[in-house]
Amino acid sequence: MKHIHLYSIIVLLLSSPAFAQKTTYLSKCGDQQETIVWQEKKTNGKIYLYVTQENEQHEYVMNKSFQTEKWKVTNIQLQTDLTIELRNNIYSLTGKFKGKSIAKTIKSNGYVWYQNIAYNAGVLLKDKKTVKHECFRPDNIKLYAMVAEAQGMEQFMGTNTNKIEVCLTGLLSAFWTCSYYFNPETLSFVGYKGVNGKPGTPETIIKIIK
């Protein structure tokens, strides 16, 4: 009986949302191929998402409404170790970015901060058509206002998914857009299509593999 009781406790603990759940994706851009690993856990009313892609690690801290409160990006090869936190509509940036020291503040544009829209757009747009938000562009750490818009059902890699398009706002909307794909039942992220670079850059395609 003791063994059965202990086994039940272990199963309960491992199934608890406080423990990390792991998801792996494959990213392809031209001839380049990389693995992306997501690990998430929920504890003390916070959501923690850890993302690893090659030499780069991202840590996101979100509240129950999926609003980003903190984002940390680390890449030793690029001499980057930067933390951004939001308090009272003011972003605090501290650390190093591409070898340059940063210690400054930036005022929010007044939108909700969703630094990793792939994580939560499926849930956010379940009963909405559009969601405005803001995020920092990872390659230059500039703050942009964005719009995510539900596009309905669409096939992605042979599977029915909920498609969501994300673009810049205003006049900039004509210059960049990308597509995210979500499982219609779990609302979890399963894929991405978009050009992440200058004109002529091959399209990046991300798909879930396990």
Regions found by a protein language model. Give the residues of each.
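Short, charge-rich amphipathic segments
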Residues: Q21-T24, E56-H58, I106-N120, K142
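Sec/Tat signal peptide C-region and signal peptidase I cleavage site
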Residues: S16-A20
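An exposed acidic His-Trp-rich patch
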Residues: D81-A103
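Bacterial N-terminal signal peptides
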Residues: Y7-S15
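Low-complexity, intrinsically disordered regions enriched in charged/polar residues
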Residues: S8, G30, Y111-Q115, G200
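Surface-exposed beta-loop interaction hotspot
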Residues: K96-C135
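Positively charged n-region of N-terminal signal peptides that target proteins for export
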Residues: M1-L6
